């Protein structure tokens, strides 16, 4: 595996928190989890410096996938003029993301049976094909639109890996006191890529000028098309570099496992699904994640369409989307680091986050209805409500992932997170499907946000948490 990557100084024993007992009701389940440990094997507990390189490569791949997925939403007005896209085309380009999750279970099987390296290489190769397809120079606009749609489909097929594999990577490479942080970084970078699309697109691609004379409009259309193609070529180059790096070095696992949980045996693929579908607590918390995050992801993808009726420009909509996701990424990583230090507090963190999400989404929805509510509709209020909503919802993702794995351990991490992200994308896909037909008036979409956040808050409140994997690492290992 390349032992030259680490030295004695780079290897250490993981910090097993002092005196941490299991959550109420977790003792029996923790002992059952301990039963899956192998009778003999290498003593776990080593972490390697190369784990940060593996995390960096995976995070860059997730960043690029989010960037490519959200290429068209922030520049939808320019794309309409350059490629004669309709509102249905823009919504469909965003919809290819959740549609790409349909073969999610195949990628989960591949991750469970063949490991991280093969899955990541296949994912990055699909992204190379997808971004390359969008760059093929053709003069026929109809053919060009088909190539763009095909490229977005292939990029959507990369979604299951970048969204599901973060907890698997953190368990495989990181110790118990670093897992939540590693999960947050790996899972948040996909959202950060989508945020950068809000920034890169409107800054590189100029907005169309509908009042220009005919000859000037034709020249402007060619200029806009050239700038869009510049973005497409740049994204293709970035994806090719990441694919080359993962092909050169991306080991499937470290020489020695970093924790007891990483060394333990897991349930089979079939038994894992039986365990998940029969666990009511898991189904409850899975819906608490899937419904609001699916609604918010679809809402973010068409944010420009939603803000256009309230006279928000393409550039302002891009900045609002950018800061809402960036804020969520920063707070999410900070929350995960806090969860690594103060263990057993995941439910409380989620309750606080979704209380804030419910209030901020209600504020935004009522602000957009200022003709009825008479609330001030200003740039400041739109920025504040959208950014707070993004911070509260996006930062909950790594906390949810850790809670999923703790709840159903020893079900493999990739299968657990694959099921919940599939559900999330299913809800997102259903909403975007309606957007493709009802894209002229989207105020109904805004009301889906506070409703889904409130439902999730109630589900989390009724959820009974347990920490089976943490019990195994901290108590059984001691």
From Swiss-Prot:
Key word Phosphoprotein present: no
Classification via CDD domains: MFS_DIRC2
Keyword Transport attributed: yes
Matching InterPro entries: FLVCR1-2_SLC49-like, MFS, MFS_trans_sf, SLC49A4-like
UniProt topology in membrane: Multi-pass membrane protein
GO cellular component: intracellular membrane-bounded organelle; lysosomal membrane; membrane
Cytoplasmic side: 1-51, 111-117, 174-184, 251-281, 336-347, 406-414, 464-478
Family: Belongs to the major facilitator superfamily.
Record's protein name: Solute carrier family 49 member 4
Organism: Rattus norvegicus (Rat)
Gene that encodes it: Slc49a4
